[in-house]
Amino acid sequence: LSGRIFCPRPVLSCSKSRPSSLIKIKETQAYKLHAEIGLEKSIGNSDKQGEVLNPMNMKMNIRFPYSMQTGDKSTSLISAMTFVKKNVGWGYGSQIRHKQAINKKEWNFGNSLTVNIWVSKDISDQLSWSLRGTFIDQAPIEGRDIIIMAPVQTSNPANYGGQTYEIALGMNRLISFGNGNRIGLELVIPVKQNLNGPQMERSHSINLAYQKSF
C-alpha cells in the first residue's frame, strides 16, 4: 500500500491525495510484472478568487481560470501496469497508467493516459543513469464553472489537454544511511506537443525525488 500527497508551489495547500496498492502478477529472477490500483482525491480549492486589472484599467474581483485552481474536487480511479527487467547491469521497463474520473462535481480536469518506457545502466554499485520516453494523452476539461468568465483563453474548458511526447535523462544514487534509500535527479524535455486550442506549451523541467524501498 502506498500513498502520495501533492503540494504545488507557490500555493500553500495540498492538491491531491492518492492511496494505491501494488499487486504482484509475476516475478522471476529476470523480470517483474505488477499492477497498481488506487483512488486519487482532489483536495485543492476549485473556487479561488482574486483581484485583477481589466482592459478598462479597473480592478475587479473574479474567480480564477481553471489552470489557476489547485483542484477540481473530483475522485478518480488510477490503474496501471508496470514491467521491469534486469540484465547484467542494464534495466528496462515500461508502464501504462490510466486516470478516469468516477465522482465529479460541476467540472473536472480531463481523463488521461500515460505511457512510459525506459532504460537504465549501473555505473557503480551506488550510481546509475536512465533514459526515459513518455507519451501523455489528456482529454479537455469536462463540464464548466459558470462563474469563471475572465476574458482569457484559460477560461475555456476546451483549451486544456492534448498530447505530449517527452524524453528524460536521469541519475540515481543510493544513499549510505539505512537500506533502500535512493535519490534521483532527472531532466525532462518535451519534444512534441499537440495541445487542444491555444495553450502555453510545456517547458523543460527538473525532477528531484527520494525513494525508500522496503
Indicate residue ranges for each PLM-predicted region.
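Outer membrane beta-barrel transmembrane domains
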Residues: 104, 109-214
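Outer-membrane pore/translocation modules
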Residues: 2-97, 101, 154-156
